[in-house]
Structures are given as C-alpha cells and as structure tokens.
Amino acid sequence: MIMQKILLATSNRHKYLEFSRLLYPLTLEALPEDLKRLLPNETAKSYRDNAKLKGMALSEIYEGFVLADDSGLEVFSLHGEPGIFSSRYAGEGSSAQENIDKLLKNLQSKNITDRRARFVCALVLVKKKKILFETTAFCYGIIADRQKGGGGFGYDPIFIPEGYSLTMAELDEKQKDLVSHRGKACQELKAFFLENRMEGHS
C-alpha cells in the first residue's frame, strides 16, 4: 500500500500538535487554510456524530484518510455541562479562559461540592466517505478549585485526573498522554492501523 498522511479535521493548532505527538509514528497533515471553510458547524447532539460530520465533509474532497474528533468536558453535578458545547460554553467565539471562568463561577454560585467530571474524546477515521474506525474514550477526575499549571490547553488547568494531585496542565506530556481521553483514543487508533496493516506514514 502507498504510504500516505492522515488529514486531521481541525483548525485548532493545539489539537494538531497534540494528536501529532499521540499518533507518532503515524503522520498527520494539518488542515490547509483553503479547506478550513469546509469544516461544518458542530450541530449534532453527540460527540461521535459531530466527529462524523467533520470527517465525512472533508472526505468528500480528500481521497486519503481523514481523522476527525470531537471532545468535551462533562461535570456530573451540572448535568453534563459543558458537554458538546465545551469549546463555546461562554458563547460563540469564547476563549478557553472565558469558558473556564464560566464553569468555575457556575460551580461556586451553586455551592456545588461534588466536582467529579470526565473528559470525552470521540474519534472517527474516514476514507472515501466510508467510516473505517470509531471510538470514544474517557478520562475521569475532578474539577480543581482554581487554575493551576501552564501546559496543555482548553480546560486542562482546572481538571485533576484520577490518581493524581496535579491538574492536566501541570502534568508533563508523557504523564498526560497516558491518562488523557485523547491519549486513550489514539492508542486504539494506532492498534487499528497495526492490526489491519494499514499505512499512515509519510
């Protein structure tokens, strides 16, 4: 089989860098500027369906592998919020800091002491409009009282994974990759490529 790259269906630079690290030695291709306009709005009601929307849309015009994900944070005592709206929790175009501020404010204003939560990552691999692989992985933990750490992105500074006393943003990359939702999903994808002897290298 001809070796080929995997197009990552995201315009998020942080996600591209993290997935590139997690999927090594598979080779990811960043989404070109002229294709970013083809990314559909995340209008589905589940992570997996949102990932499928993005993967199938790009597969319409890209002949190789397309990898799409949708991720989010769910706080159990907030009935799963922010959930599929994690990236825009504080409104359309909101920053990661604004989303964090809103979440911490909600927990504080409602005097919530049960801060259990989980990260979710739905991953879908598409080629020629056919779904070849899909999985959903989780990382359980709690929401910290305040932000800590300068690593990672998104809600990492306020999420403490099970078995740790540090936030995701305080963990080094190796530690984070072992426990994170994306790390677990990517391990499954790499196993799929290996089991099916498929090529995703440059």
UniProtKB/Swiss-Prot annotation:
GO biological process: nucleotide metabolic process; purine nucleoside triphosphate catabolic process
Active site per database record: 70 (proton acceptor)
Keywords, sorted A to Z: Hydrolase, Magnesium, Metal-binding, Nucleotide metabolism, Nucleotide-binding
Region forming the signal peptide: none
Binding site for substrate: 10-15, 71, 153-156, 176, 181-182
EC numbers, comma separated: 3.6.1.66
InterPro entries attached to this UniProt entry: dITP/XTP_pyrophosphatase (IPR020922), ITPase-like_fam (IPR029001), RdgB/HAM1 (IPR002637)
Cofactor(s) named in the record: Mg(2+)
GO molecular function list: dITP diphosphatase activity; ITP diphosphatase activity; metal ion binding; nucleotide binding; ribonucleoside triphosphate phosphatase activity; XTP diphosphatase activity
Cofactor details (free text): Binds 1 Mg(2+) ion per subunit.
Any one GO CC term of the record: cytosol
Residues engaged in binding Mg(2+): 70
Catalysed reactions, semicolon-separated: XTP + H2O = XMP + diphosphate + H(+); dITP + H2O = dIMP + diphosphate + H(+); ITP + H2O = IMP + diphosphate + H(+)
Role noted for this protein: Pyrophosphatase that catalyzes the hydrolysis of nucleoside triphosphates to their monophosphate derivatives, with a high preference for the non-canonical purine nucleotides XTP (xanthosine triphosphate), dITP (deoxyinosine triphosphate) and ITP. Seems to function as a house-cleaning enzyme that removes non-canonical purine nucleotides from the nucleotide pool, thus preventing their incorporation into DNA/RNA and avoiding chromosomal lesions.
Subunit structure: Homodimer.
PANTHER family registered for this protein in UniProt: INOSINE TRIPHOSPHATE PYROPHOSPHATASE (PTHR11067:SF9), INOSINE TRIPHOSPHATE PYROPHOSPHATASE/HAM1 PROTEIN (PTHR11067)
Family: Belongs to the HAM1 NTPase family.
Protein name (database record): dITP/XTP pyrophosphatase
Organism ancestry: Bacteria, Pseudomonadati, Verrucomicrobiota, Methylacidiphilae, Methylacidiphilales
